[in-house]
């Protein structure tokens, strides 16, 4: 777009700024995702390993950020047992990410046991959603 103006008999031509180029189609946005566990287990499933690799890449691409891994359980079992199981789950995920190359000091763990369910209800579907590690960026 051109703008023309007159000043003391002189004509000036001023070009409007060009719009920025469109973003590259190769930009990939990685985000943190939860990992899920089988009943009464802290071993990683295949889908959990895949998500942990994505979470590791996010951490590698954000060197100024830290993570907290929250270990969670379903409502079955005692509070003490579930706190210990949640801790094992969080530590298993941390160990996996550290083995991929992350600095251990950038990752904290905490267990909430059954205290902070994601899904309400008393069904296998609800319990499966609550047996998880949740990742919080800091």
Feature annotation, model-predicted:
Residues 7-66:
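Periplasmic peptidoglycan-binding/tethering modules of Gram-negative envelope proteins
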Residues 34-37, 82-84, 134:
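Short aromatic/hydrophobic contact patches that present stacked aromatics
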Residues 1-5:
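Sec-dependent bacterial lipoprotein signal peptides
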Residues 47, 51-54, 80, 84, ...:
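Extracytoplasmic/secreted proteins, especially bacterial periplasmic and envelope-associated proteins
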Residues 120-123:
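Short beta-alpha junctions and helix-cap segments that line functional grooves
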């Amino acid at each position: 777009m051109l703008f023309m103006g007159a000043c003391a008999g002189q004509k000036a031509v001023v070009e409007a700024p060009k719009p920025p180029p469109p973003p590259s189609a190769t930009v990939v946005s990685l985000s943190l995702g939860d990992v899920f566990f089988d009943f009464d287990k802290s071993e990683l499933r295949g889908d959990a390993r895949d998500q942990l690799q994505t979470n590791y890449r996010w951490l590698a691409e954000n060197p100024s950020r830290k993570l907290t891994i929250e270990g969670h359980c379903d409502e079955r079992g005692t509070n003490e047992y579930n706190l210990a199981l949640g801790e094992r789950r969080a530590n298993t995920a941390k160990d996996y990410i550290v083995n991929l190359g992350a600095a251990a000091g950038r990752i904290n763990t905490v267990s909430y046991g059954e205290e902070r369910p994601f899904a309400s209800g008393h069904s296998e579907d609800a319990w499966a959603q609550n047996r998880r590690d949740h990742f919080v960026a800091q």
